[in-house]
């Protein structure tokens, strides 16, 4: 069982991810924005982070920048609901995200990515 931190300002997305990941046997922690997520990760590093890109207070990109400065080996999957904004997800990859997904995304594909990243 892995511990996964979900960072997303949309409660419905967090709930869907939490339910899916818990059903797959993972422990889940949640944060509603990048600032909360970074603070949680500093207190208790997790095996994987799934973060939205566009959020209030501290965006996913800003959070990734701070995270990768402090934690070089943090595993991150970035998600974005902004249609056509490939540059945001491309930027996330440049900042250290291992995988990226556009919302809405296939939960099967996300779970496959989660399992792969946890194994590597």
Report residues per predicted region.
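Active-site residues of response regulator receiver
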Residues: 8, 52
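Short hydrophobic/Thr-rich beta-strand motif most characteristic of the beta2 strand and flanking loop
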Residues: 25-32, 40
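Hydrophobic/aromatic residues positioned on beta-strands within the core alpha/beta folds
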Residues: 79-80
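Receiver (REC) domain active-site loop signature in two-component systems and cognate sites
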Residues: 55
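C-terminal output helix
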Residues: 105-115
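Alpha4 helix (beta4-alpha4-beta5 surface) of REC/receiver domains from two-component response regulators
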Residues: 62, 83-101, 112
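Acidic catalytic/metal-coordinating carboxylates
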Residues: 33-36, 59-63
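Charged docking surfaces used in two-component/phosphorelay signaling
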Residues: 15-23
């Amino acid at each position: 069982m892995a511990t996964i931190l979900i960072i997303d300002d949309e409660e419905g997305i967090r709930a869907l991810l939490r339910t899916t990941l818990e059903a797959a046997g993972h422990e889940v922690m949640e944060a509603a924005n990048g600032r909360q997520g970074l603070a949680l990760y500093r207190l208790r590093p997790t095996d994987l982070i799934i973060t939205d890109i566009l959020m209030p207070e501290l965006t996913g990109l800003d959070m990734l920048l701070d995270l990768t400065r402090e934690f070089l080996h943090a595993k991150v999957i970035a998600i974005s609901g902004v249609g056509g904004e490939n540059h945001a997800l491309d930027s996330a990859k440049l900042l250290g995200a291992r995988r990226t997904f556009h919302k809405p995304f296939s939960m099967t594909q996300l779970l496959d990515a989660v399992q792969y990243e946890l194994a590597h």
